[in-house]
Regions:
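Conserved catalytic core of the tyrosine transesterase superfamily
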Residues: 1-139, 147-201
């Protein structure tokens, strides 16, 4: 039988997808990093956020792993969304982001890389974003980099937060949305002063 709106599968998918988008965006993760996050590698830090350990990453040549700090926010909080998903799915270990079948059963395996991009595009289409088919597994990272740049983060701070070691990698993400720096310059231009009115005789 078809599932009714508001059913457990719908609720689980909503919580998973919300956690995936918010964690991916606010942490600046690529798609392959998101699907490698494991429940046992998350640690809550009361009043601050949580830490997320990835045993390996693209720039980790020594294979020592990296620990990323995820902030707790007053709105659109990635920490709250992540733990609500963990609680709803009853996860204790293993991959954080998994498939959910039509009956609401949460799988044991991580989402496959080939299923992540269609999932992301479907979520963006539902959110009303245009050209959703152009988004890729790097889009959440690119979106965060653009947001941070527009809100005054300098390149060094952004590199430290995301984990870039090469400034050229950072600039590829930053310059993509505003290659001529028009938006940044326009935003900092002073308002045109009002013309003085006619002088009284």
């Amino acid at each position: 039988a078809a599932q009714e709106p508001g059913s457990r599968p719908d609720e689980l998918r909503h919580r998973r997808d919300r956690a995936l988008i918010l964690l991916g965006f606010w942490r600046g993760f690529r798609g392959d990093e998101l699907i490698r996050v494991r429940v046992e590698h998350l640690r809550l830090v009361p009043g601050e956020g949580m830490t997320c350990f990835l045993p390996r990453s693209k720039g980790d040549r020594q294979a020592q792993g990296n620990t990323y700090k995820v902030p707790a926010l007053s709105r659109l909080c990635p920490v709250t969304a992540t733990w609500e998903w963990i609680d709803a799915a009853g996860l204790t270990e293993g991959p954080l982001f998994r498939g959910i079948n039509r009956w609401g059963h949460v799988g044991e395996e991580a989402l496959h890389p080939n299923s992540l991009i269609p999932l992301l595009r479907r979520l963006l289409t539902c959110a009303g974003l245009p050209d959703a088919e152009e988004y890729s597994s790097h889009s959440l990272r690119r979106g965060f980099a653009g947001w941070a740049n527009a809100n005054g983060w300098d390149v060094k701070a952004l590199m430290e937060y995301v984990g870039w070691r090469d400034v050229h990698s950072a600039m590829r993400y930053i310059d993509g949305g505003d290659p001529f720096a028009r938006q940044r310059i326009e935003a900092s231009l002073p308002e045109t002063p009002a013309l003085p009115g006619p002088a009284a005789n």
